[in-house]
């Protein structure tokens, strides 16, 4: 078995799987390492559903989303498999976020529609907002079939010659005479490039970062309708993916149809509690992560039972100081070491675009999408 590679990708979540696939696709001999068994639920990439959307308050995200769509369309064609469902995105806000998104989408020529809060209920009877709210509909928004994305990128990676080792723990990485080495509990590999896509474990492998990385424990809540006869209003054919921002309260929520658990839609508070315990087994069920969605549902979603969630799952966000991704080199590290991380709860949809950009960087090429906005050079050294 070979121990010499062009690229070793550490971490086989969605960022790592997309990165490894794109590296191998452009001719880089690539090894993908995962500390847990494939299919584990210890990080940020498990579950059946995620949101995809062009709509963003920062225009720098839009082209990454477009690149991700193109890759998914290609995989659907190659595999003959449906990897997402176009439901449309409903973005509602009490502040001026809708205007920001409208400006960005107009600049990029992306089809969308701005509506008044009072008009939302006419489109989607699940909701009832007053004129203090504004809405935007992104028709290309939809449900990512998250588990299928992971399997697709890993399968295609292996089909074109990529190697995956799961249950293999990286112990260290080093540089000797301009060569990079990765030492695991099973072997030692040499590589021209190392790409870390390790989620909340980033500080384990890069402990000397000059800025703070914050892992967050998230409670993912699911809710049913008050009356079973209305349960169809929560399925993919009737329920959009949703971003809801109460800007006056600084409370942000997101929601998806009942893809994960039929009859129960996903509706979650977008933040959680700092994760200080075992990263693989985060604490969950912080009461505010239940109370805040419940309060919103009771106030704005008349057909949904907001008394208590039907189920609570766990997930981990990894946040950078400004909640944007980190893509590329780290100023204090060897330039042949790259990082793709800090998805901050929104990175799944752009993982194919991030993976392609990292692969192009590893090959010494100009990136198809400008990702300079996500460079770690934007951070000043932390005082902590």
Swiss-Prot record:
GO molecular function: flavin adenine dinucleotide binding; L-pipecolate oxidase activity; sarcosine oxidase activity
Free-text cofactor note: Binds 1 FAD per subunit.
EC number(s) stated in the UniProt entry for this protein: 1.5.3.1
One Pfam entry name: DAO
Cofactor(s) the protein needs: FAD
Reactions catalysed, as given in the entry: sarcosine + O2 + H2O = formaldehyde + glycine + H2O2
Post-translational modification S-8alpha-FAD cysteine, affected residues: 315
Residues binding FAD: 6-36
Record's GO cellular component terms: peroxisome
Record keywords, A-Z: FAD, Flavoprotein, Oxidoreductase
One GO BP annotation of this record: L-lysine catabolic process to acetyl-CoA via L-pipecolate
Stored InterPro entries: FAD-dep_OxRdtase, FAD/NAD-bd_sf, MTOX
Entry-linked PANTHER family: PEROXISOMAL SARCOSINE OXIDASE
Family: Belongs to the MSOX/MTOX family.
Protein name, UniProt field: Putative sarcosine oxidase
């Amino acid at each position: 078995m070979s121990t010499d590679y062009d690229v070793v990708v550490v971490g086989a979540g969605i960022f790592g799987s997309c990165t490894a696939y794109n590296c191998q696709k452009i001719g880089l001999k690539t090894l993908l390492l995962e500390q847990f068994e494939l299919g584990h639920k210890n990080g940020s990439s498990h579950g059946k559903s995620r949101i995809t959307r062009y709509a963003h308050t920062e225009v720098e995200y839009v082209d990454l989303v477009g690149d991700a769509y193109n890759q998914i369309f290609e995989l659907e064609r190659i595999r003959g498999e449906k990897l997402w469902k176009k439901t449309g995105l409903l973005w509602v806000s009490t502040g001026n976020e809708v205007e920001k998104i409208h400006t960005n989408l107009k600049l990029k020529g992306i089809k969308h529609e701005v509506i008044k809060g009072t008009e939302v209920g006419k489109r989607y009877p699940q909701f009832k907002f007053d004129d203090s709210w504004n809405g935007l509909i992104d028709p290309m928004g939809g449900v990512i079939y998250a588990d299928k994305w992971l399997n697709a990128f890993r399968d295609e990676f292996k089909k074109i010659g990529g190697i995956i080792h799961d249950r293999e723990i990286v112990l260290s990485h080093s540089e000797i005479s301009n060569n990079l080495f990765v030492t695991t509990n099973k072997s030692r590999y040499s590589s021209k490039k190392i790409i870390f896509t390790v989620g909340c474990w980033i500080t384990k492998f890069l402990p000397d970062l000059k800025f703070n990385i914050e892992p967050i424990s998230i409670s993912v809540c699911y809710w049913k309708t008050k009356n079973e006869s209305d349960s169809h209003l929560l399925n993919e054919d009737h329920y959009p993916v949703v971003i809801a921002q109460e800007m006056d309260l600084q409370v942000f929520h997101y929601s998806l149809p009942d893809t994960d658990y039929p009859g129960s839609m996903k509706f979650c508070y977008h933040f959680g509690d700092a994760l200080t315990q075992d990263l693989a087994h985060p604490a969950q069920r912080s009461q505010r992560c239940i109370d805040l969605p419940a309060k919103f549902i009771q106030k704005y979603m008349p057909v949904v039972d907001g008394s208590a969630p039907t189920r609570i799952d766990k997930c981990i966000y990894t946040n950078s100081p400004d909640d944007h991704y980190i893509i590329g080199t780290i100023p204090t590290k060897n330039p042949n070491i790259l990082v793709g991380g800090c998805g901050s709860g929104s990175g799944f949809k752009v993982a194919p675009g991030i993976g392609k950009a990292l692969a192009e960087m590893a090959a010494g090429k100009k990136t198809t999408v400008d990702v300079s906005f996500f460079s770690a050079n934007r951070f000043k050294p932390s005082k902590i």
